[in-house]
């Protein structure tokens, strides 16, 4: 594999796109073309990227561009990383365009967290199809080093080995080699847990619902971020795309655990997508004095209410015995 000096990140204005751009620029010391729908969004993403790795100096390595520059950026790049929304048709369109300009020996990859790598590889002309891989970095990548690497049946396995070495030795990723199955490895497990928690919140809405389930499945199970809070952090639109993909393309004993609850779809329809949109399953309110107040969506009433700090008898007994 050629030395990775120039990288293009497609969809760089998104949270993950900006964060991944920062990883390539900081750890990889690469020049990164940040491709977004418009240049102003790309410029703002470059600033966020610097902050995500606590290194404003990398902004000098980040070049904001828009999609009108995609062809020339891809031609100049040693690696092209697509980080667009988790939508198969959108990704097919983008990879078809990338494939027209990808140079021989360069690497193309998708940051998809679970869509078919084989299907996306088929967007590329035969002469460069072997250069395409799945590289799913976990969010936020500066703090979570886990990275899923996935080949397609068309992949050049020598190039795959070189890419794995680059991810490990240069970008300091902890690489998990994954099969090309819906949601790969991490999200097949993680989104099963999150979606089941959302289902339980609906089932136990009379007990409190969302924050009730999070209180049970958070610290008591060793999680620093409870599962429903995690879904809010990921984005409800992304959550839906992943669980819908798993539901449509699998049929195992946990199939029904990937059915999206109706109240989550309702929030998505209202553009309440979670932390990135300012409200979703949770909503943080700031008053004029700067004090913060966490609200939670009440499934039964369809409104936001104050988050409840639950106490559970088993937790009180545990504290008693631990003293």
Question: Which positions does each model-derived feature cover?
Answer:
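N-terminal glycine-rich phosphate-binding loop for ADP-containing cofactors
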Residues: 1-323
């Amino acid at each position: 594999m050629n030395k990775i000096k120039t990288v293009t990140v497609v969809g760089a204005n998104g949270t993950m796109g900006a964060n991944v751009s920062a990883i390539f620029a900081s750890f990889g010391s690469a020049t990164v073309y940040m491709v977004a729908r418009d240049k102003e969004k790309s410029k703002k993403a470059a600033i966020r990227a610097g902050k995500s790795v606590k290194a404003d100096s990398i902004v000098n390595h980040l070049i904001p561009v828009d999609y009108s520059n995609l062809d020339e950026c891809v031609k100049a790049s040693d690696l092209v990383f697509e980080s667009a929304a988790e939508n198969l048709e959108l990704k097919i369109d983008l990879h078809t365009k990338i494939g027209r300009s990808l140079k021989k020996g360069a690497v193309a990859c998708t940051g998809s967290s679970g869509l078919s790598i084989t299907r996306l590889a088929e967007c590329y002309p035969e002469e460069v199809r072997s250069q395409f891989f799945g590289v799913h970095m976990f969010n936020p990548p500066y703090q979570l080093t886990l990275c899923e690497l996935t080949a397609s049946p068309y992949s050049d396995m020598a190039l795959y080995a070189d890419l794995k070495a680059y991810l490990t030795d240069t970008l300091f990723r902890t690489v998990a080699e994954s099969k090309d199955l819906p949601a790969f490895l991490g999200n097949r497990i993680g989104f099963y847990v999150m979606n089941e928690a959302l289902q339980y919140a609906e089932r136990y809405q009379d007990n409190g619902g969302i924050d009730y389930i999070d209180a049970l499945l958070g610290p008591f199970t060793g999680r620093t971020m409870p599962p429903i809070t995690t879904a809010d952090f990921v984005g409800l639109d992304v959550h839906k795309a992943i669980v819908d993909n798993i539901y449509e393309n699998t049929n195992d004993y946990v199939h029904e655990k990937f059915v999206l609850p109706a109240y989550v779809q309702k929030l998505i329809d209202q553009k309440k997508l979670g932390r990135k949109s300012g409200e979703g399953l949770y909503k943080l309110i700031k008053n004029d004095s700067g004090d913060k107040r966490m609200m939670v969506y009440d499934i039964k009433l369809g409104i936001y209410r104050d988050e409840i700090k639950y106490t559970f008898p088993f937790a009180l007994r545990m504290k008693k015995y631990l003293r």
